[in-house]
Amino acid sequence: MKRGEIWFVNLDPTFGHEQRGRRPVLIVSPEPFNRVTKAPVVLPITSGGKFARTAGFAVPLTGAGTRTTGVVRCDQPRVLDLAARGGKKIESVPDAVIDEVLARLAPIFE
């Protein structure tokens, strides 16, 4: 599990405003962390995400050269055990996408 990989996973159970259902997620935590914890920090990818788009928390995958479409929701980080949730690696994003995602994620933790 490496930063920049897209996995397809079941996010349920969820509560309230959390993204739900089976969907792609982007791994944003570094590989050494993922190796030790077996539970990477991920961001959901959605075709909706109106709030994230208008609030500046969405990074579009349009033009990134990925089969996965939609936007990465930088406002919804989660730690998931991908194996326990039946996750499957789909593909990886280019470095430019992960750089933009990390730049939009950073202010949340300041």
Q: What are the functions of these language-model segments?
A:
Residues 1-110:
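Conserved functional hotspots at enzyme active or ligand-binding sites that engage polyanionic ligands
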